């Protein structure tokens, strides 16, 4: 290998052209950048990047090939009060690295210094970037492009979904390969979901605190390298990209979209006491929101916050998203703590990143889902994201739980949430699909735990049960824990059925947490982010098959109801919906606000949802006509009903006319 040629300022990252590798690095405040390459024995050779165009440093290394391990040492001022923390003693990951070798360990050499720089060299323990080739044969792959109105999302963890699946080959359980295996594809099709939403798959690290406690970051919301796949779920690190793309291709052939949960709000460098392994040492002032005293704005609760209004960071974020779409063919993203994306530092719908995404022909056409809050002032922004974003709807989650798990909730409030929360999302030209309805998610109780626990039980997390929310709107039905007498277990089953029916038969985009259709429990842990064990892994051998069948039947029923699949707002008199009381008459103003939780919802003039959320068996007079219960509510003896349905306490049934 020779000295570096000047090379080009684009594309960003390390790009192999068949003859060598072009390297680029964005840093607005650096004074000098060294490329450091390592041989198989760990010997290091350094090259100054000779070119600079604007804020991008670049150089070309002839003869370099995929597999080359590299990093950067970036020279510049150490001025903490101004937000500058350059320290060339620290080897830094390329933010655009497509593969990472080594883990981010809790090691003192990885700290760049607090008030004064730590000049101890860290190359021996620092993770390394690795040059790759992106070539892959996609064959005839095509994106399913499922319309929002027909979309049913299934949120899952790569490892936890398949690690205990007895029908999968042992060697692929808990890996990318398992996602596209025929056993899993067949299950997804049988269940009826249309999109698999994966918790973070970009390379992530366990926080030093967890490492010291003997725990790991299981969920993955602590990103190291946003362009690199987490290698632990591959047969080998060099195979991660191809194995992930194989899974995407297999899922696409079955008509199933792949959505990635992506963390663009903070990095694993954490606060000023965290490790310096990339952005902090490359250009701390540009990449992060810095306070006047040089510390970080912590709007994420993770110690730092990415400055997604800085032009260089906006470009980084957009290129990251485009990489996953163009190189890995993913169909969309769920953005963690997405209010950070709109901070300028206050939240704005025309924030630079939102504008860039909307203007991008690649990104503006995939599914974009915001978790519409962060922990900073003004961070709660449900309903305020611009199109084409959809949003997690916590109003729906809380209302569904409060309606069925006895709490005070009016019929009017329930109906509003059932109708895609039009008071929140019917703005800026957005359709009902912008409301992503959920009962549960990775963060919080599972559905089974919602009906078994009144209190969180997070002792295993090592924080003396202080972590996790206390606002669960759950109901143990009279006994804390999973067990109980038969009548209690039946009441819990009925509550689960009612909640699932509410989720899957409401207007908006439903999201189902993997395992809720099995009856999976985390034994009351509502913050299992550090539990990479049987607490979070789905136990397929113990799955409640009847509940799975019930859930699949609800999804099939949903796809038959035009009022739910049309993705247009319901208007009075359009035939999509009628709201009726227990006597099949329009609900009065008093019944909307003060009446018992009894109602009927007539959809598309032929599907009737009869609801008795009271504690008493109640007769409900059906609208005129002949009605027959539909699966999963129809029994073997399924007579035509022409007058009255005897609604059991906390009961729900769906009928079809004719």
From Swiss-Prot:
The active site is at residues 336, 371. It comes from the Bacteria. Pfam families: Alpha-amylase, CBM_48, GlgX_C. The record marks 443 as: Transition state stabilizer. Its EC number is 3.2.1.196. Pathway: Glycan degradation; glycogen degradation. One of its GO terms (molecular function) is hydrolase activity, hydrolyzing O-glycosyl compounds. Keywords: Carbohydrate metabolism, Glycogen metabolism, Glycosidase, Hydrolase. One of its GO terms (biological process) is glycogen catabolic process. Residues 459-484 are annotated as: Disordered. It catalyses: Hydrolysis of (1->6)-alpha-D-glucosidic linkages to branches with degrees of polymerization of three or four glucose residues in limit dextrin. Removes maltotriose and maltotetraose chains that are attached by 1,6-alpha-linkage to the limit dextrin main chain, generating a debranched limit dextrin. NCBIfam families: glgX_debranch (TIGR02100), PRK03705.1 (NF002983). Belongs to the glycosyl hydrolase 13 family. HAMAP family: GlgX. This is Glycogen debranching enzyme. It comes from Salmonella paratyphi B (strain ATCC BAA-1250 / SPB7). The gene is glgX.
